Amino acid sequence: HSVAYNKDDVSAVDENTETVKREVLDWITKLYAKHFTKVPLVINYHRVLGHPTSQGTANPNSESLVALAISNGYCIRSDAFGMNNSSWGYSTWEKAIAAQWRYKVPIIMEGGYIVSSHSYWNDPAGYRQGHPEDVRQGEFDSSAEARVNMMDFRVGQETESWFNDAFSLVQRFVSEGGYRLYPDQVIVPDQVSAGSRVKVASRWRNMGWGYFPNNLPQWNYKYKVAFALIDASDKAQKVFVDKDCEPSTWVESKPFSY
């Protein structure tokens, strides 16, 4: 939740802190990106990112630090969804960051409250004591607003709470969350002559909240739309890759025709 730059005083802040924060974040994110080239990398978007203290008003440099991590190949996540405290929860600053990077990098959600041990009923949202489903609903609503690609249900009792207290929300995310790509229209001729040219038209939609992160540097647009001419034995005799189709641009259920 915080980063210490002084071994003698882990919460120390001085005139060099902001410079050192940026240098350290740039170094560590580039180091990970250098060695983890095939899997997505993720960093928390937090109002005091990389700071010696873990709460308070948003640091004016935090937004640029998030952008720095993203430029080095990172996705973003928050582990404070459902918390509405303006000092350390998921509030105006975090929502603005999510809106800024929506459909550009994946956003991952984790709830802030452990309902079995945290006093979630003191939250400004007015969650009722003894009603963990209120917390789950708050987390879900913030996730929908942020258009998250993934919801982290944690482990143990937290996972059980999602399935026992708010299973309908789990079902909704399964059907609505992340990316949901499908061709809602494909036009091909029913007969073709050998050696002739064939025109294929397709229309695609993403029915999910999120987007398909084909643009991540670790994936580098490797997922493509392709059409194949298949013989009677189901063997592809010819494959055509449509280079004009880019699934990372398909968002908000809009039709994309090619």
Locations of the language-model features?
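Catalytic-core regions of glycoside hydrolase
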Residues: A4-Q157
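Catalytic cores of secreted or luminal carbohydrate-active enzymes
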Residues: R136-Q191
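Structural beta-strand segments of beta-rich domains
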Residues: S196-V200
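Residue-level recognition of well-ordered beta-strand positions that form the cores
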Residues: A201-R205, A226-A228
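Short, acidic/polar linear motifs in exposed loop/turn regions
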Residues: N206-G210, S233
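Short coil-to-beta strand junction motifs in C2/discoidin
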Residues: F212-A226
